[in-house]
Amino acid sequence: MTESLLYSGKAKNMFQTDDPEIVHIHYKDQATALNGKVKEKIEGKGQLTSHISALLFNYLTVQGIENHFQKELENGDALVRKVKIVPLEVVTRNFAAGHFASRFNVPMHKALKPAVHEFYFKSDSLDDPFINNEQILALEIADKKTISQMKEEAELINQKLINLFDQIGITLIDFKVEFGFTSQGKLLLADELSPDNMRLLDKESGKSLDKDVFRQKIGDVRIGYQTVLDRLNNKLIAGEN
């Protein structure tokens, strides 16, 4: 099987397979911060990210949320459906953190009810700026139907993930998702689902189990990722037996 590189990003490489509708993803052993301005090689992180993402995509599939994930390969890589990504990040916030907390001068981890959904324009050169519905429409990035569908899907995903993480002793602070269109014009959840793009706190200790550990330089990011993976495995895999 011959593959050609489609995309090389901060966290993953994507290759075109012999099937025009299927893409091969390889997750890098790398952590980044400040939109890629800070990066560090971390051995084994790629497989942790891939395993967690596979478990969460499969869980959401069972929950009725369609996504691009197809299968995880033996080497820890993944096969996904090829989509044309909408250049928008959808960030869902259940508790104040990061830029939201500083922007509005609210206490860290203040509960947000209802959950806040925000759009950010995908542009490394512009540092992924916040963008509102009217700006999205004016710049012809997406139409009203797509904007509405993405927000509705983000809310559904939020409820499903809150429920899952609550059962394994983890609080879902916030997360980022992306969506893309298949060649048939169907909008699917895409990209990845891992502690790289969500904030997770251990309910008992209050410790971060996500990339904030790397951003804030407070330890080995793999420890938190492994904790998340172990708990998801125990719940979703071992729990089935």
Swiss-Prot record:
One of its GO terms (biological process) is 'de novo' IMP biosynthetic process. GO terms for molecular function: ATP binding; phosphoribosylaminoimidazolesuccinocarboxamide synthase activity. The lineage of its organism: Bacteria, Bacillati, Bacillota, Bacilli, Lactobacillales. It comes from the Bacteria. This is Phosphoribosylaminoimidazole-succinocarboxamide synthase. Pathway: Purine metabolism; IMP biosynthesis via de novo pathway; 5-amino-1-(5-phospho-D-ribosyl)imidazole-4-carboxamide from 5-amino-1-(5-phospho-D-ribosyl)imidazole-4-carboxylate: step 1/2. It is an enzyme of class 6 (ligase). It comes from Oenococcus oeni (strain ATCC BAA-331 / PSU-1). HAMAP family: SAICAR_synth (MF_00137). Keywords: ATP-binding, Ligase, Nucleotide-binding, Purine biosynthesis. Its EC number is 6.3.2.6. It catalyses: 5-amino-1-(5-phospho-D-ribosyl)imidazole-4-carboxylate + L-aspartate + ATP = (2S)-2-[5-amino-1-(5-phospho-beta-D-ribosyl)imidazole-4-carboxamido]succinate + ADP + phosphate + 2 H(+). Belongs to the SAICAR synthetase family.
